[in-house]
Amino acid sequence: MAFLRSFLGAKQIIRRESSSTPRGFMAVYVGENDQKKKRYVVPVSYLNQPLFQQLLSKSEEEFGYDHPMGGLTIPCHESLFFTVTSQIQ
């Protein structure tokens, strides 16, 4: 069951190299410390989810409102990001 939830959650997260972001989605950069950040596109509805808001709080603690990537940067390991986003459904 967890695999199915993870698979369905992965359909909502889009890894995009291009700078375009579809309507109703937002770009976030995910990665820890000096590791290269990867860009993902997630639904804006995630902003209302308590689990995602915990990631945003971690981002605010580390960066304040000045994000070095120019977009929203979430300072966590990719596996944690996928775990959190797979639980939002």
UniProtKB/Swiss-Prot annotation:
Keywords from the named record: Auxin signaling pathway, Cell membrane, Developmental protein, Growth regulation, Membrane
Subcellular location per the Swiss-Prot or TrEMBL entry: Cell membrane
Keyword Acyltransferase: no
A Gene Ontology cellular-component term: plasma membrane
Induction summary: By auxin. Induced by epi-brassinolide (epi-BL). Induced by cycloheximide.
Membrane topology: Peripheral membrane protein
Recorded superkingdom: Eukaryota
This protein's record includes keyword Chloroplast: no
Record InterPro entries: SAUR_fam (IPR003676)
A matching Pfam family: Auxin_inducible
GO BP annotation list: auxin-activated signaling pathway; response to auxin
Family membership noted in the UniProt record: Belongs to the ARG7 family.
Main function: Functions as a positive effector of cell expansion through modulation of auxin transport.
Alphabetical list of PANTHER family matching this protein: SAUR-LIKE AUXIN-RESPONSIVE PROTEIN FAMILY-RELATED
Stated name of the protein: Auxin-responsive protein SAUR15
Originating gene: SAUR15
